[in-house]
Amino acid sequence: VLPVYVELLKALEEKGAEWIQIDEPYLALDLDDEQRNAIQKAFGYIRENTRLKIIVATYFDGLKDNADLAVNLPVEALHIDLARCPEQLDSILNILPADKILSLGVVDGRNIWKNDLEKSIELVNKAKGKLGADRVFVAGSCSFLHVPYDLALETKEQNLPAGIKRWMAFAAQKIEELAAIKALAGSET
């Protein structure tokens, strides 16, 4: 399967892609040595066969025992889910190699509720303080495919009362939250 995957990546590269994201929530599971070795080998093969910059995205939980594996994969950036597991930030900051970018999943892509901006900004600023702004990306915890598209389209008061609606954020609003966090934290990306 890997050679076919690399063919697809090369086609993207030929079309002008510079970055790709590989979602790997599997890294949040309990893995044995054989599974860890397979992941390392797969990413090594991809790295050897493409010049694309790669971000590996983990989500739905923390990296736990797979943190060392994840930070040492041959990729340019690592994405972690801080909405689900904010306590992993300190340990990741302490072991992240100096050449890696860290993407912080601070806006929850799994629910319809507004973000705690203060908490998210605190996490972003902690990472920026340790890594520098040029090595910190601000992102959703995972894809926003789990939430409805746009709260502005919910116009019927009887279906969604204003008192509840004001606490909600759908995908469009979550993108606005990301922009606000980026601006308020002064993040480069």
What does each of the following model-derived ranges do?
Residues V1-T189:
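Domain-level signal for soluble alpha/beta catalytic cores
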